[in-house]
Amino acid sequence: MYDMKNNRQLCWDFEIVDQSQGICLRQHQPERKNVAFVADEDWEGSHCGYSRILKTPDGIRFYYRADNIDFSTYTFTHTPYVCMAESKDGKAFTKPALCRFAHKDSKDNNIAMCFDRYFDNFSVFYDENPDCPADEKYKALEGREIKAADGTSFANGASSRRRLLYYKSANGIDFEYVRELDINGFFDSYNIGFWDKETQQYFVYYRNFHDVERQWPDHSFDWRDPRARRDIRVTTSRDFVNWTQGQELSYGENAPDFQLYINNVQRYERASGWFIGRPTRYMDRAGSPKNFEHLTWNNDDSRKRLIQARGREGSAVTDCMLMVSRDGRHFNRSNEPFLPNYLENQQNWLYGDCFMTYGMLETEADFPGEPTELSMYCGEGGKNYPTRFRRYTIRMDGFLSWHADYEGGMVLTKPVTFSGDSLKINFATSAVGYLKISLCDVNGNELEGYHSGELFGNSPARPVDFGKSLAELKGKELRMKFEFSSCDLYSFIFE
């Protein structure tokens, strides 16, 4: 028996389904919207990314790595920075003058963090642990390669080691290094952390590697080896000091061993018990050289020259996937892209496409009268162009749905109980489609007075009317029957 209480039930898997006919799990894609801001300042440039959107008591903040590559020489033109933009509505962003670090002798910029060396990634999160000290409310993680001093090596004989460094800040602008975290990994991607109020612990999702045969000892590999595969691992901690052994995420039996870059895993705040991730999928297409002659960004031999100079950075392509989980370790993942590469132009089908910003934000709809939606962001352009951070939207809970075509389908749940007095559904039908809901006893027999009739429309919160009061069934074991035609059901909730 499954107790739904008064929690939102997402139709993102078939965990509560006992029987179904004509139903599939449909993945939806976000809508492309406006450019939120352009990284076109002298201290920004064509190679900006590894970004994070946060809504905190201090407002809406957008952190990103800012750097620029001269693609005539394939060299960085300045040391990478961590920059911060701000917004009041999540649609348009401004760059505040933080006046912390100088670029070309001027501090009139939005640089929030600067190193005297190259850095790969720096991810910020706001710590919602109520016991967190005030000067640590903002935390940041940096994956760094630490090299041994000249003529020396580390205990294992290596000339360098990869570590995850922890920084703290009271205001999210002035960061102070604290320590290395006791976590083993490679960390050469966007490593993220957060406090999980449901399990009362910290999660860190980070980059590591394995080999295709899974025979290498952990951390004993060369990432350049063609057998190496980029993966995502997770570790947890109650105190941000002592960490569990990292575990590789699993995606079910027979799941393709895709190479995954940034993971973008977070709690889905609208529904208890769910994690959602939007990892970037990486594929080196060096084995298809003739195709590059016809692919975009090759009209002036730019890609050919990049392949010759940097190898995989010119021959690899990337897109964004979707994965969901109930425990943060075992994920259901589609093999189709969540954010695909669009029609070819001079700024896409490149290594670095579809690296979505970590986090999402509830924003007002663009059309009057429509309900709020979820905004996400992704950098685009780059290479010979300043990076543009574009906004994308999706309806609330709209990542996946139970779907039936016009021919129809049915779902009968396992025995469940609920705690609310009313039922609301997030659904969409065609003009001829419908959804019918019946409440049944544990044997599947429809209960008198608890049939909705045909429901049609497109609403994230449609009330469902029954002939009798739901209060009479509160806490009682029953089943729910859904009958579909040309319909998507995204979620439902007893309130």
Please identify what each model-predicted range represents.
Residues 1-495:
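Carbohydrate-active catalytic/glycan-binding domains of CAZyme proteins
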